[in-house]
């Protein structure tokens, strides 16, 4: 699966994620956005929520994405980014 297919799937499922989980914004970053993924690469997704969510909803969203994409997903909240790595991630993220 390539970057464009991942973006298409996320875009198609975004309305459901907005209503179910309070997702405000999703973005792809890491090896898939650079198109340098390997067979064992996970899909790195940056998320912003429009409401407070608990750990169970966060983990449920990750499982939801993994089941739709059929790959392991590394889900990262934009609000939890550390300054050093956050700058790099924000410079490469492609929002869906």
Predicted regions and their residues:
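Catalytic core of pol beta-like nucleotidyltransferases
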Residues: 1-25, 33-39, 50-96
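Short hydrophobic/aromatic beta-strand micro-patches
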Residues: 46-48
């Amino acid at each position: 699966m390539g970057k464009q297919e991942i973006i298409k799937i996320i875009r198609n499922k975004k309305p459901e994620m907005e209503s179910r989980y309070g997702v405000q914004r999703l973005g792809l970053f890491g090896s898939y956005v650079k198109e340098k993924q390997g067979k064992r690469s996970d899909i790195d997704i940056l998320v912003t929520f429009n409401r407070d969510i608990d750990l169970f909803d966060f983990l449920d969203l990750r499982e939801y994405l993994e089941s739709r994409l059929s790959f392991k997903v590394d889900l990262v909240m934009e609000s939890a980014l550390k300054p050093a790595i956050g700058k790099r991630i924000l410079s490469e993220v492609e929002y869906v």
